[in-house]
Amino acid sequence: MVMATTLFLLAGLAEIGGGYLIWLWLRDGKPVYLGLFGAVALALYGVIATFQAFPSFGRVYAAYGGVFIFLAVLWGWWIDGKAPDTYDWIGAVICLVGVGIMLWAPRP
């Protein structure tokens, strides 16, 4: 469980960070090297996910989607300075509950 959580966090940071760097380059007129670093981070995101021990690609990526939502709320708060409201937190927590059910519910 610790390894799965760590990999989800690393993948999330790579995806959100990479997307953010590309956003800064294309939307905010920042230097092109930020876009290139963003592209590398996005490629790393794709690689990091392959280290998950779960056998199903679909389940891993669906569960990761819930982690991504939670991390995106935190990123918006900590990096962009946009405080989440109550509904953002409720939605993010619901997503994390879904992740737990998808990955760790007992299966036959």
From Swiss-Prot:
Membrane keyword on record: yes
Record keywords: Cell membrane, Membrane, Transmembrane, Transmembrane helix
Transmembrane segments annotated in the record for this chain: 6-26, 31-51, 60-80, 86-106
Membrane topology type: Multi-pass membrane protein
KW Transmembrane (keyword) present: yes
Top-level taxon: Bacteria
Residue stretches in coiled coil: none
Subcellular location(s) of the protein: Cell membrane
GO cellular component terms, A-Z: plasma membrane
Alphabetical list of PANTHER family matching this protein: UPF0060 MEMBRANE PROTEIN YNFA
Matches recorded under HAMAP family: UPF0060
NCBIfam families per the UniProt record, alphabetical: PRK02237.1
Family per similarity comment: Belongs to the UPF0060 family.
Protein name: UPF0060 membrane protein BH2744
